[in-house]
Amino acid sequence: MDYKQLVAAALAPALPDLTQEAILDKIEQPKTSKQGDLAFPTFTLAKTLHKAPQMIASDIVEKVDSSDFEKVVAMGPYVNFFFKKDAFAADILNQVLSNGGHFGDAKLGEAGQVPIDMSSPNIAKPISMGHLRSTVIGNSLANILSKLDYQPVKINHLGDWGTQFGKLITAYKMWGSEAEVKADPINNLLKYYVRFHKEDVDHPEMDDEAREWFKKLENGDEEATHLWSWFRSESLKAFKKIYQRLDIDFDSFKGEAFYNDKMQEVVDILEDKHLLQESQGAEVVDLSKYDLNPALIKKSDGATLYITRDLAAAIYRKRTYDFVQSLYVVGNEQTNHFKQLKAVLTEMGFDWADQIHHIPFGLITSGGKKLSTRSGRVILLDKVLDDAVALAHEQIEAKNPDLPNKDEVADAVGIGAVVFHDLKNERMNSFDFNLEEVVRFEGETGPYVQYAHARAESILRKAGSPEIAATEQTLSDPAAWDTLKLLSEFPATVVRASTEYEPSVIAKYAIHLAKAYNKYYANTKILVEDDELNARLALVKSVSIVLKEALRLLGVKAPDEM
């Protein structure tokens, strides 16, 4: 049962001028439990009803059928609803226990496909902390949408094309070795590329050779294509090791190169629709009616640009997946690019352009400075994960040295801490990254939530395996009531996270639930043999289920022991 819907339905006859949706939007959580469980404010009705809000609240209470509630009372300008605690508890616990991890599932997406463009590192360059946000936000959104019956398609749009490959081929032929690349593809390919840029200062002829190699690559030369393909596959092997650590997989690795033969169609459509204009020798699409700068489609030398490739990709994805939404999890510095992309698609006559959504995000900083810049502040993601796991190991050794599967748990805690810290921050906010803070077991961290789950599992192990069922039994501790209400909010929280494309909604919910449960745990002797034992165990089991599922939606594991 959705209790917000129940309140809205009770209010509807008393508010004939408001739709059910409008009533739902106004319902809020009171500040304290003394003010009830849900409340309806009447301030906004004062103008239309020409009455004081307090009087409106009193009038509504008289018209409301309160039989589904313990009581409905007017408190100043609010109509306050108090739930029947025993029935509410039994209903919520029954929903969680009977559905397990599927609690909160909903058939909203009707199996519609949603491509998610995410992560997208450059071939022959390391995955840095700069890639973390796109990767974990995209993965979490895929999990959330999947829970609501969408079919996410995780696309890693690799940076696998461009003039840099001419330089890389030149550098490899001058100084490279197959054995070195196979042993450590990313670091050695990067080493060759960096050396190229150092040496071409005194040897400008190297630039000519690089241009020649890229031209060969564009023309399908056998050797150039073989080397490019090999650099790509070796890099991808290295990338997949990191994705494996994060427990993230992809449905497609089609990168920039895949669209090489698909861009001409874009140019043809733009020409057919007379959308291309000449500007200083280049070809552009005028977007002044959208209050945007012109979209540069072709440079004066005839070379196509990034947006042309993205237009080709958008058209390909619509044809391939017939998507209901198409998401691009890309930093907020690209906001203008995606506005242009949608505007050009609209001008081309594609009415599905509105289904494209840019999911921007802020930066990760260190000491207030951007992490990944040309000043050499690149922090490798692999190294951060190693350090996080090592820190988790230290904490586990201190807290629980006899834990049987320490390595596995340290992995889940350390890596989970990094992912959780990223996702608990609203995605548009930039945040400072401090590893010691991130891997703490106290405070608003991933390990804190994981520990609350492990603590619940520990209680259930100690209880043995009794038949846990939700019955209308009183849970007398006030902290139990706060925990129950939070459990009831999980389905709506998942929906909100999906509509706002905001995983932090789930992360913050998990923190609140863990705090409420820890308060309950501290104030209640759970394993006492009395009439409430079954109800208490049902609550503990439900908390364990929902915390585990909330963490799963974020892409974080929930160990049963810590």
From Swiss-Prot:
E.C. number(s) listed in UniProt: 6.1.1.19
Record's keyword terms, sorted: Aminoacyl-tRNA synthetase, ATP-binding, Cytoplasm, Ligase, Nucleotide-binding, Protein biosynthesis
Main location, first listed in the record: cytoplasm
InterPro entries: Arg-tRNA-ligase, Arg-tRNA-synth_N, Arg-tRNA-synth_N_sf, ArgRS_core, DALR_anticod-bd, Rossmann-like_a/b/a_fold, tRNAsynth_Ia_anticodon-bd
CDD domains reported for this sequence: Anticodon_Ia_Arg, ArgRS_core
Disulfide bonds, paired cysteine numbers: none
Reaction(s) catalysed (UniProt annotation): tRNA(Arg) + L-arginine + ATP = L-arginyl-tRNA(Arg) + AMP + diphosphate
Motif ('HIGH' region): 121-131
Tagged with keyword Acyltransferase: no
Biological processes, Gene Ontology terms: arginyl-tRNA aminoacylation
Entry's Gene Ontology molecular function annotations: arginine-tRNA ligase activity; ATP binding
Subcellular location(s) of the protein: Cytoplasm
Any one annotated GO CC term: cytoplasm
Pfam families in the record: Arg_tRNA_synt_N, DALR_1, tRNA-synt_1d
Keyword field contains S-adenosyl-L-methionine: no
Superkingdom: Bacteria
Quaternary organization: Monomer.
NCBIfam families assigned: argS
Family: Belongs to the class-I aminoacyl-tRNA synthetase family.
Designated name of the protein: Arginine--tRNA ligase
Source organism of the structure: Lactiplantibacillus plantarum (strain ATCC BAA-793 / NCIMB 8826 / WCFS1) (Lactobacillus plantarum)
Organism ancestry: Bacteria, Bacillati, Bacillota, Bacilli, Lactobacillales
